[in-house]
Amino acid sequence: MNGTGHPANVTGRVELEDTGTELVARDGATELMRYVYRPESSVYEGPKPYAHPLRTLAGDVVSAYRPNDHRWHKGLQMTASHLSGQNFWGGASYVRELGGYTDLPNVGAMRHEEFTGPGRERLSWHTQGGEHWVDEVREMAVDVEDDHWTLGLSTSMTNVRGEPLLFGSPTTHGRPMAGYSGLFWRGPRSFTGGLVIAEGGQGGPEMMGRTASWLAYVGEHDEVDRSSTLLFVAAPGTTWFVRTTPFAAVNPSLAFRQEVELPPGATWSHRYRVVVADGAWDRDRIEDHVRSHPLDDGAAPGEGRS
């Protein structure tokens, strides 16, 4: 690993550069990921760290940044669309009484505080009014294999507000099949209409609101004659927010249909793996990969595979 400044957890062939506002992971001449931990975002867009661009080993971009339909969609990022009346997502909030979205002075920010060890980041969540509600520890690892690379990600969120926090979504507030909250990926325009493959023979846009421990999205690129696959692995029983139209998006939701209460002082932890692969992986290839790379393989959160 070659780094300048803050450490990160990467395997031997990955080089890392810290610019003071971003961590850039490279495999040779290919930039795989740019993790922007000090973003220049407006309050309305919900300032928070994000990973964009994400690229395959072949160099194809597999994420979107500030699309004109949702300016707060930025690659891959951790979010909370409804948190005790606050919006750590960005943009307008869904209001049950109005039956729609409206702009409110409730858009919070997730602030990078420091890197405390290899791949380990400390963040704090603040409401638009300046109240400190959550302390988060986020751990990341980057690992490269023959035709794909993997981002391992874990998050531990601790309630420091002094009263219960309720994690929800537009669906918990009355909008059907819109339960987005948590780790969210926005795909490039060319991935619109892509293929969704999920655990247990499931697949397609019908995965919206269904449960699975993993879900893959296969999309085709513009300009080059190539496809790419993103595989998202989460805990068993995860409910997914997924769209293929009008845009590509995947989210293992924190609170799709029911609010989750986090008591004062309590910590809520989640672990994910995102595989970025060259080519259109079929179900057999995906299932083989999941079997050989179990999420609960005993590695510590953020620990890479050697």
Question: What would you call each of these model-derived segments?
Answer:
Residues G119-E121, E136-R138, L151-L153, L183, ...:
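Hydrophobic residues positioned within well-ordered beta-strands of beta-sheet architectures
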Residues S228-R305:
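Beta-strand-rich recognition/accessory modules
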Residues E22-D27, G117-S124, L151, Y217:
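Generic recognition of long tandem-repeat/solenoid scaffolds
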Residues Y35-R38, V43-P53, E145-G194:
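Acidic (Asp/Glu-rich), glycine- and aromatic
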Residues Q77-D147:
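Extended, loop-rich substrate-binding clefts of extracytoplasmic carbohydrate-active enzymes
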Residues N2-G75, E145, P164, G168, ...:
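Beta-strand-rich N-terminal accessory domains
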Residues P164-A235:
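Active-site/ligand-binding surface loops and adjacent short beta/alpha elements
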Residues A58, W125-G129, M140-V144, M157-R161, ...:
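Beta-strand elements of well-folded, non-transmembrane domains
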